Amino acid sequence: MSLVGQMYKREKPIPEWKTLMLRELEELFSKHRVVLFADLTGTPTFVVQRVRKKLWKKYPMMVAKKRIILRAMKAAGLELDDNLLDDLVRGQMLLVFADGNPFKIVKEVEKEKVAMPVKPGDKAETEIRIPEGMTNLTPGPILSVFGKLRIQYQVRGGKIYIAKETVVAKPGDVISEDLAGLLMALGIRPIEKGVRVKFAIDGGVLITEDLLRPDIEAFRGDVIDAAKEALGLATEIVYMPVPEAVESAIVKAALAASALAAETGFIAPGTVEDVVRKAIAEEAAVVALLGDKARELGIEEAAPAAAPAAEEKAEEEKKEEEEEKKEDQELSGLDSIFGGF
């Protein structure tokens, strides 16, 4: 028997407002492809009101408890694992209905936050600073708190002036009673409270919390690396449907052919210079190996003809252009393979 079927049977008639809510939820579940589920445990009511006020024109929202949510999902034909839903749907939840990208909508919903004061015993979520400047506080017993917290101050015109910005709490620090009172007196609300989406449903597919907030930059890097590897493989096998791969393969083959010609001494247009250079280098190596014996045998190292400076510069520029062209071909291939990501 399903989770919903195991629920106790109600002896009293269901109130009309609950019946109407159930019908409205069922309609929303049936009408919208994407549903976000935000756990409201420990979330102040005014925070939820702020989110609804900001986004209600874009996204229908409802606050409901577990039992009615599960009944509405069942009635709408959302066939998901009952045991999994039992673990995910807890207490009162804010439901956000939409039809767009669930990941973008999660960011949009969670960015709506309300500044709140801290209470004694709270843990600082971020670094808390008291800025330099004039306050509305008058000197008195509160100066002892400034001393405890090592906040530099001056008295100007009968008011306390904070002489230097001071860090009074770091992430994880427990807020003391003195600090909470001082922050309240200064009107500093260091906590930003909002709703947090626990999971989402997109077209009947469950998206758990660990997947709702992907690292976009890391994902982008992975795609670019994969594209480069794909282009490298396409070049290696000369994959014809990718023109950039064919061009890179031709350049690679030309370089390999030139190296092979120089190695074997094959004379052809464009290989003469490489063959001669290799022969001279090999001769020099033999002369060096023979040492004094070479002079006894009358063998001398041939002096290579000095190339004009302009010719050497042109040759270097040509090589640089070829390298740049090869890099451009590899990078432009990413667009061809992945549609301009």
UniProtKB/Swiss-Prot annotation:
Domain of life of the native organism: Archaea
GO biological process, one term: cytoplasmic translation
Record keywords: Ribonucleoprotein, Ribosomal protein, RNA-binding, rRNA-binding
Gene Ontology terms: cellular component: cytosolic large ribosomal subunit
Presence of the UniProt keyword Hydrolase in the record: no
Region (Disordered): 301-341
InterPro entries on file: Ribosomal_protein_uL10, Ribosomal_uL10, Ribosomal_uL10-like_insert, Ribosomal_uL10-like_insert_sf, Ribosomal_uL10-like_sf, Ribosomal_uL10_arc
A single MF term (Gene Ontology): large ribosomal subunit rRNA binding
Keyword match Aminoacyl-tRNA synthetase: no
Function: Forms part of the ribosomal stalk, playing a central role in the interaction of the ribosome with GTP-bound translation factors.
Binding partners and assembly: Part of the 50S ribosomal subunit. Forms part of the ribosomal stalk which helps the ribosome interact with GTP-bound translation factors. Forms a heptameric L10(L12)2(L12)2(L12)2 complex, where L10 forms an elongated spine to which the L12 dimers bind in a sequential fashion.
Family, similarity comment: Belongs to the universal ribosomal protein uL10 family.
PANTHER family: 60S ACIDIC RIBOSOMAL PROTEIN P0, LARGE RIBOSOMAL SUBUNIT PROTEIN UL10
Protein name (Swiss-Prot/TrEMBL): Large ribosomal subunit protein uL10
Species, as recorded: Aeropyrum pernix (strain ATCC 700893 / DSM 11879 / JCM 9820 / NBRC 100138 / K1)
Gene: rpl10
